[in-house]
């Protein structure tokens, strides 16, 4: 009993001595009394157990254990994801899974759909969804770190002898495009962050009275989105300029992602199953009317598109599929060396190259005018039968960024449309209250402020084609100038072959074929 008491007194004395330098003078006078006071061992241990020194240890251990549990759960999740990829999405292990390239492409697409599918408003992403996106896309993109190629490198030995050896490096297209796509990804997410704290427009519930009143012709086809509201007088000039600036920035990002996606798709091999399903000539694929328009002596791609019925997405996609099929047919006829093939035709090679160039021009215009168009039959076939994992990652990553850019631009257009309606309504009310305008002017202004549903939809489609769809390439619409005038007659020459990226940059030169140098 005596040793235990002495041990308790010594521990208490040392504890009070350590705290003596931090105590006030009044407390210093009480410490000798505290040091001489004897306490039972149980009370001494209880008092020591409540000290900050002892309580900090279990708290630290709990934090460490939680962190370890979180890391372990993330590791298990990553193992499950990669197990599913290795099995080709066939968890039964029966060998019925898809290729690794297609499985990885589907994984990136499904991840983006689960993360960005809930982005229905112009507002920053939720922190948990943002963290999940960054973490899981890093997992999927880490596969490309191990897709390497051999490149020559010089190594200097200790004796000063320079020797050339082969070293591994990430494949060239991945080394260039993966960092670029990551940058585009960050720019799109930062665009959403730029709308933090803006209170000049807001969203209301679809089922509320205010939400029903906020519905218009533009939002009737987007019933799943919450209607946007703006002040009665519309947005301020600074807010309107900010929206246009963000829209231009997103359009440039989408243009870059679209160019990367088109380049990757062009490098993918065309599957044999798609080639076997094609007709023998381009006339059958296009149809008589389209073939006649493309093969005429005078050809203007804008005028050609204006004559087509592109009122629905299905019709636009059908035209795109027909044109892509004809391009594949003409290219095969140009490069096929087998004279016994049944692909022979009486059309000369120069004309076939000219027709191919015109068809590719139409494709570029369709992709720019309808950026949200679904994938064509050729693109789906390439993605489905692709075996290159690197191409699969680049194609899927660029495609989802292109889709995210289109979504953000659509949300910005919704706000700008609501602002235009509010300003038109405000202008109409001021005009009717003034009473100083003639009757004819009143009727004209009333007609302009009370558009019918079809007129509003037509007006918005025209404005959208001027600002949203053609803005990707910095090309203004000049279709209103001289539509009835024929282009000047030029000698029949074989056009210069341009790549898809060159067409995006030099779209203004598509009115007439150029000389092939």
UniProtKB/Swiss-Prot annotation:
Ranges of Polar residues composition bias in the record: 39-63, 440-452
Span of domain PRONE: 65-429
Coiled-coil intervals: none
Compartments, as annotated in UniProt: Cell membrane
Biased composition (Basic and acidic residues): 66-76
Key words, A-Z: Cell membrane, Guanine-nucleotide releasing factor, Membrane
Chief localisation class: membrane
InterPro entries named among the record's database cross-references: PRONE_dom (IPR005512), RopGEF (IPR038937)
Keyword set includes Cell membrane: yes
Tissue spec. comment: Expressed in pollen grains and pollen tubes.
PROSITE patterns: PRONE
Pfam families found in the cross-reference section: PRONE
GO molecular function: guanyl-nucleotide exchange factor activity
Region span, Disordered: 16-76, 428-517
Domain of life of the native organism: Eukaryota
Calcium keyword on record: no
GO cellular component: plasma membrane
GO biological process per UniProt: regulation of pollen tube growth
Domain comment in the entry: The PRONE (plant-specific Rop nucleotide exchanger) domain is responsible for the GEF activity.
Self-association and partners: Interacts with ARAC11/ROP1 and ARAC10/ROP11. Interacts with PRK6.
Biological role: Guanine-nucleotide exchange factor (GEF) that acts as an activator of Rop (Rho of plants) GTPases by promoting the exchange of GDP for GTP.
Name under which the protein is recorded: Rop guanine nucleotide exchange factor 9
Origin organism lineage: Eukaryota, Viridiplantae, Streptophyta, Embryophyta, Tracheophyta
